[in-house]
Structures are given as structure tokens and as C-alpha cells.
Amino acid sequence: MGAGESGCGAAVLAYKLGFDVFVSDFGPIADKYKEMLDRHGITWEERQHTEALILNASEVIKSPGIPNEAPIIEKITAAGIPVISEIEFAGRYTRAKMVCITGSNGKTTTTSLIYHIFREAGLNVGLAGNIGKSLALQVAEGDKDYYIVELSSFQLDNMYEFRANVAVLLNITPDHMDRYGYNMQNYVDAKLRILQNQQPDDAFVFWNDDPIIKKELAKYSHGKLYPFAEKNHEGAAAYTHEENLIFTEPTPFNMELEELSLTGKHNLYNSMAAGISANVAGIRKETIREALRSFTGVEHRLEKVAMVNGVEYINDSKATNVNSCWYALQSMKKKTVLILGGKDKGNDYSEIAALVKEKCCALIFLGADNSKLKDFFGEFGLPMFDTHSIKECVAQAYKIAL
């Protein structure tokens, strides 16, 4: 179900394994994916779901963008047909070690950084999940020794037997509340699924100062604990001391904070998680150090785009929830014109209220319905502007900042 990167990758793997495969997407299918399916002789349909074919399946692989409450998925479930994710399916057919990363914020940066370290170490490694090529397609085209897998809560929802040899949980803050019935515990439970099936010799890397993780941890079995925190505490696998980043296990080493290529407190935590994950995998400390120095960052994540007439333009469009906006604002050193918009997912903007008052000189809203944003920020006394295209939005920001 679904014919994007995830669904088509799963279809190719299933075809190569000898299964009868049918791909159905209620929306249009991109030409590149039609070509991929046609090249393998895989039957597909778009803009409809033919229930007679779908409900005849022995198993359904669901793309993460399709909610379990979608009418066709409810019919599939009612028919007793198992519904799994592409990651779950691909995991059955590889012996590669899985380093899996989730969290409300920092997933893409941390996943990319871990992948960078493994590549610098010369390992046979793939980048998959919510980033890069689908895991299933990589397994189909030629397996790896390691996969670095970014996992969203949507992907974790339909995973059951999959095992993360190294599970990384960066943080848990409200996100996708619309998808989880506006129930925070449902979202938390989805994130903690990353620990299911871990064995004692696996590793669980996590932010020790996250109150939700600390509260929930006792409910789950997991591998060996590798907590990280800004300040040292008993059992910390990484922490800071004075101007140094200290890694304590399995192989102790340290480096100066100013050597890290990524800046900001949130990126310090991302670097800790990545360094521990590589350390657990047995990568030499010299390689980890050098890779943490040389990493160039991720597109659209606090990406410095241009400096025009003394005004710096920063693209942080990967910040898709309130908490990630908080981290971005915290890192701003100058007065900021903040662009907010997109789909409201049950957001609580009170988390960024103090920083908006402190850091921002104007707010620009970009979205179909900005009423909630205007209602919340209207009393702040800041200039506010409605825009309806990115071109109009940037032009307005340019005027304000001059």
C-alpha cells in the first residue's frame, strides 16, 4: 500500500524473493516509481484501491504515510490480513547490523552523522529509513554489513519482529498529535517500540535528561544502557566537562568542544549519540574524532543559505515541530524574523513563547490557515504578516530585515 520510496522498494524486494506482488496507491504515482515497477514486471494501480485484489493478499506492507485508521487499512485488518512496515519486511531478509535512530528532533542530523562516521571508517554501510534509499530496495540490490536507519514513529507503528542492534532515542516531545488521537502516551509508546526485541548484548543510546524517557524506561526490556548528558553522572557514556566532550565507554576518549563541526546544544547531543553509536560498533576513536570534525551538516537544518546586505538567511525547514523550533531559536545570536507555518499537528506554542519574545523582531506566517498562530502570538506586540507562497514570504522577510 503506497507507491513512494518505501512502497516501491518493498515491492522490488518482494518480487525478487518470488512473491506475487501488487502495488496500490490512492493518489498518483510518480513517473520514476512507475518505471521502477514496470522494469520488474510488477502490477500497480493509482488513484484507486481495488479491494478484491487487496483483500486477497496474504500480507500487506503499508507505507508510513498511510494511517492505520485509513478505511482501506481498517478493512484489511478486519479481514485478518497482517499489516507491516517496509522496515519490518526488509529486516527479515538481511543479516546486517541495524543502527536505528528515533526521537522527536535531531533524527536526520544524527542519522547522517552516524552514517558519515561509518563511511569514514571504511565500513560497508547503507543509509535508510526516513532518509536515503529505502531499506528494502538496498537489501534487494545488494546487502550491506550495517544499515543506519532513521525511524519515524509512523514506521515504528507497524514493526513487530525487527531488531535494532543499536537503538538511539534522542528525545521525546509532543509531535504528530493529530495522528495519535491527541494522546501523548500513544506517541510515546510508538517511539519506545524501537526497543522491542533488543537482546542483552545490544545497545540502547539515549538522552539521560529527557523526563519522558527516564519515566518510561523501566517498562521496557533493552540492551546495555549508554546514556548521554550535558553534565556527568554515574554511568554516563558521554558528557561535557569544562570545554571537552568526554566519551567513557566502551573505549574512553575525549575531544575539545570547539572541534565539533556542529554547533548548538541540540547538536552537542546529536554528536554525543553519534559518537557513542560508533564507539559501540568498534570504530577507532581517531576515526570518530575526525568524522565529528569533518561532518558538513544536513540540508534544511539550520542551513546558512546566504548573507545579503548584512542579513543572514537560515533555512531550518526540517524543523517541523515546536520543540525543534525552540532549539533553533535558542541558537540565534541576532534579532530574528521567524517564519512559521505548515500543518498544525496539535501544537502547543507556549514552549517557544519566551524565546519568541526574547529573540524575534517580527513573525511571518506561511500556511493555509494561520488563525491558531495569530491567536497565540497576537498579544506579543510583534509585527505579524500573513503570506501564501514562499516567494512572498521571503520578500516580506527581506523588507522587514533591511
Task: Go through the PLM ranges and name each one.
Residues 33-34, 350-402:
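C-terminal helical cap/extension that packs against the catalytic core
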Residues 15-16, 51-57, 64-208, 212-223:
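Phosphate-binding loop of NTP-binding sites
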